[in-house]
């Protein structure tokens, strides 16, 4: 009976891994396509399309943004809604429920955010580009799990769960950073209205309201309020996800609003929204000049060293110390080699790093440098991480 309950709790994690690992492969393909187009004769058409303005609504009740902004500010709100639901699910029923389970991935995620941010800040100290310190903090779970699924087919489930939990905590950290540090001038009226709507979502949850359309309407209204408030509108997606009804046990969870939304939106986010985001944001011109410029550019150096080196030091270092001090223990059948391989894969920033870079820089040259370096660092992390998992013999090795 105990094992049955345990498996029920683990199943959402393993299903999530299946979706995200498959999505990572699609994401890689879309990023490559975008880079090829941006470096071909179709580059002008590509840029014209993503910068074409689309207006939704009528007169005073309308929103007008470029296709790129509709993707980054609109579609990505759905991606963040899925992230919010995942975080809530894992806090209530999953690997983030108890301190014992949480301490290792949470500490690893914090280490994996702090060290890269410090490295970036050292390269860009006392320069305007220091605003990009949040870029190397992120881990792209789809890419990381995609690589792991390709080269680590015999990897223990514990390392999959560890990497997934770490990435979820990492996403939560990125959300907090975006909300606090990447916010423009605040419109307090819009923000207060948004918070009132969020309280209404919480109240509907407490009253056990199960009408999905009510939550959809609340979610759209919340997004509009945050769009007008100056706080990045994707935060509305997170708040909606955290506020949805989830149930008190696994049986109630299976019929909850959150479960129904997650069931529909997770594949939509993984296989449509994130690939569209990759197509719209990965189209950068790469040539000898841009690559040589990236070698000496403080933005590029901060991001590359932050993601490729900082993530390894932060994730593996924090985990190793906790295990050595016996504050935490490694998951079943997971060794220090698995842990190090996962730490390297944590340096695949991509989606969230690209997203934060678009918030950090308005100047095209700095943004291009950031995008090039994110791709370089992600390729290095993916290749090195894949090599580690490829050569590991998955046996019962001595724990750290």
UniProtKB/Swiss-Prot annotation:
Any matching Pfam family: Na_H_antiport_1
Instruction: Tell me the GO BP annotations in alphabetical order.
Output: regulation of pH
The reply on keyword Transport is yes
Q: Quick one: a GO cellular component term?
A: plasma membrane
- What superkingdom heads the lineage? Bacteria
* Transmembrane domains' residue ranges: 25-45, 67-87, 103-123, 130-150, 159-179, 184-204, 213-233, 264-284, 303-323, 339-359, 372-392
In what way does this protein cross or attach to the membrane?
Multi-pass membrane protein
UniProt cross-references to InterPro entries, sorted A to Z: Na/H_antiporter_dom_sf, NhaA
Record's keyword annotation contains Cell membrane: yes
Catalytic activity from the UniProt record: Na(+)(in) + 2 H(+)(out) = Na(+)(out) + 2 H(+)(in)
GO MF, one annotated term: sodium:proton antiporter activity
* Keywords, sorted A to Z: Antiport, Cell membrane, Ion transport, Membrane, Sodium, Sodium transport, Transmembrane, Transmembrane helix, Transport
Q: Localized where?
A: Cell membrane
* Physiological role: Na(+)/H(+) antiporter that extrudes sodium in exchange for external protons.
- Matches recorded under NCBIfam families: NhaA, PRK09560.1, PRK09561.1
* Similarity comment: Belongs to the NhaA Na(+)/H(+) (TC 2.A.33) antiporter family.
- The protein's name is Na(+)/H(+) antiporter NhaA 1
